[in-house]
Amino acid sequence: MASRLVLASQSPRRRELLAQLGLALEIRPADTDERVLPGEPPRDYVLRVAREKARAVPGDLVLAADTAVVLGGEVLGKPRDADDARRMLRALSGTRHEVLTGVCVRRNAGALGVELDAVVATEVAFARLGDGEIDWYVGTGEPLDKAGAYAIQGSGGAFVEEVRGSVSNVVGLPLAETAALLRRAGFPLPWERP
């Protein structure tokens, strides 16, 4: 039984979400290429990146995830700069979009080990934003390191009108589905331990 879970991510949001489950973590960020391959469907993209992250980090039990905002089939990753964040926010303004997270749990046990994964989708309805709102928000710096250029758990939450599905997925890690994958990998959650 793995006593410690390795999180293959430097995301403070994923760390905070897992802390809500009472999990002791070892943080080992994965160094992987997160570019979308030509013609790669968004679901395949987030799952591929999550798997690559999980495989790139040593450990008995490794958890990795990748989140993307998808609008009209286009993956909106983290903005390159403030202008790119403005472009993304203008595109999201007044629309419904999807947030996809690929989650991978890799357990190195026995001769073969186990790799379990899932893709979770959440639909988000965004308010109509004017240039003043967009400029103010980009000026806060908050959207510059977030997929799709917004943080539902921060000031960007003021622009979200509706969420269908997992809110924690939009933050960066679907907790219910992640807990289910950990259980299937033989990792008991804190409330299941003697």
Swiss-Prot record:
Q: Which residues form the active site?
A: 66 (proton acceptor)
Q: What is its main location?
A: cytoplasm
Annotated catalysed reactions:
dTTP + H2O = dTMP + diphosphate + H(+); UTP + H2O = UMP + diphosphate + H(+)
Query: Pfam families per the record?
Result: Maf
Compartments annotated for it: namely: Cytoplasm
Q: Which GO terms describe its molecular function?
A: dTTP diphosphatase activity; UTP diphosphatase activity
For this entry, list what GO says about its biological process: nucleotide metabolic process
Q: Name the Gene3D superfamilies on file.
A: 3.90.950.10
InterPro entries in UniProt = ITPase-like_fam, Maf-like
Respond yes or no to whether keyword Protein biosynthesis is given for this record: no
Cofactor(s) it depends on:
a divalent metal cation
| One cellular component (GO) term of this entry | cytoplasm
Record site: Important for substrate specificity: 13, 67, 153
What's its EC? Answer: 3.6.1.9
Q: Which domain of life is it from?
A: Bacteria
Q: Which UniProt keywords apply?
A: Cytoplasm, Hydrolase, Nucleotide metabolism
Signal peptide range in chain numbering: none
Q: What does this protein do?
A: Nucleoside triphosphate pyrophosphatase that hydrolyzes dTTP and UTP. May have a dual role in cell division arrest and in preventing the incorporation of modified nucleotides into cellular nucleic acids.
Identify its protein family.
Belongs to the Maf family. YhdE subfamily.
Its name, as the record gives it, is dTTP/UTP pyrophosphatase
* Species assigned in the record: Anaeromyxobacter sp. (strain K)
